[in-house]
Amino acid sequence: MEIAKANESLKAAEHCYTEGLYNSSVSRGYYSMYQAAQAALEAAGLKRAEWTHGGLHATFANELTRRRKLYSSFLARDLNVVQDLRHTADYRDSDVSKRQATRALAKAREFVSQIKKGISNG
C-alpha cells in the first residue's frame, strides 16, 4: 500500500467535509488513516496481502508504537477513535455531528502527516 492512497482518501474526506457530508467525511478520513497505517507497516517490513481492521490496529499499536517506538501511541488511539466514529457514520441510524467530523478530520490529517514523516525518515 502506498501512501498515495491515504492522500487520496484524505482529500476525499476534506471535500466531503466542505460539502457538509459529515458521515462520508469521517468514513473517508478513517480509511486515510487505515491506508497510512498499512503503508507504515509495509515500510517497517510487515507486509501482508490483506489486513483485517483489528489485525492492522493491533499490529500498528504493538509493533510500531510500543515495541519499535516509531510512532506516538496517540496515533494508535486516534485510529481506534476514528474507527468508532466510522461505525456510527456507516452502520448506525444516528449521524456524525459537524463537531465530531471536525475532530475526526483533524486526527486523520495528523495521522497521515506523521506516517509520511516516519516513512520518509525511515
PLM regions with names:
Residues M1-G122:
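Terminal alpha-helical segments
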